[in-house]
């Protein structure tokens, strides 16, 4: 099976900070900051709260761009290797191969699936088809809430938190396109979102607004709205 290289940078270790919170020099202690997790770092778990020890095995199917999967086993979450954008049958086939390989490696069979709330993502369609085929429950998660939850879990923060999400676009809980919101998150109890003021978006493509890949157009749209408000 294909295995891509990981892409990381090193940052000063916060665990090596002094009593005043000043991080240790980068040449003394450093931790990897991932841009792309693959060779050498998969599968390594992100540890979840102890309360999740007896939780069901869950497969998170990710989104459409820079896709990967995540499989939980008790109080551990294993992020799959870098896959890429799900834009053609070959990439989708590799996506399914990665999911099957990780399940075999961890000796885990998912008992539930979590997918993006966007109905047209290929990862969502994969989750829907598999849930129907295997009789598994399927939960849908708003795109930016998933980003916020991942950051909180990676930093072992399980209490209440406010997360400012300035991602691209994602289908919101209210059926509109979100792309900047303040989310109240509580990993052990769920979360709710407060979108920032709406604005005009460029025309839609099949999957997402054109502005998702061309931020300059979103800037012009914001300037237009400010002038006409």
Could you tell me what each predicted segment is?
Residues 1-229:
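Short acidic/glycine-rich loops and adjacent helix/strand connectors
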